Design a protein with these regions (language model features):
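Coiled-coil termination/hinge junctions
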Residues: 1-2
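Phosphate-backbone recognition surface of nucleic-acid-processing proteins
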Residues: 5-85, 131-139
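Acidic, carboxylate-rich catalytic segments that either coordinate divalent cations
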Residues: 66-139
Length: 139
């Protein structure tokens, strides 16, 4: 149900967003707007974006967190940091959009094993939490 919405909103043209996943994330409204003046630093939700895509990413992130242990762990950690439900889903959506951007750029389908290897290689804090909370298996 969400795949057609994502395809319609994002498209499959690898040149559309250039070489930077941040362009797609800003377009989708998941990237926050940061501004500062003097000693004041603030972060706000991005309103200049495709609202249809932002809503689609919100629904996708919520579905993903329910279906994925990795997604649920990521979401729970963001909530523990004091983020609202919607903000935690936008953060998860940021990660998912980065993966989609790479899939579009490389013209390859999602590879869960490759994603797991990359997370291990880069020292993902989500994997560290998953490994810490995993039940010990008897030898």
């Amino acid at each position: 149900m969400l795949a057609p919405r994502l395809l319609a909103a994002i498209g499959n043209d690898p040149q559309r967003y250039g070489d930077d996943p941040n362009v797609l994330q800003c377009y989708a409204g998941t990237a926050p707007v940061r501004f500062q003046s003097g000693q004041i630093h603030r972060v706000k939700i991005r309103w200049a974006c495709d609202k249809f895509l932002r809503h689609t990413v919100h629904l996708w992130a919520n579905s993903f967190r329910r279906a994925s242990v990795w997604g649920q762990t990521y979401y729970e950690q963001k909530r523990a940091q004091g983020m609202s439900h919607a903000c935690a889903l936008r953060c998860l959506g940021q990660r998912l959009l980065k993966i989609v951007f790479r899939m579009i750029s490389d013209k390859k389908p999602y590879d869960a094993e490759l994603h797991a290897r990359n997370q291990t290689q880069h020292g993902s804090w989500v994997l560290a939490l998953l490994n810490k909370n995993a039940p010990a298996t008897p030898a």
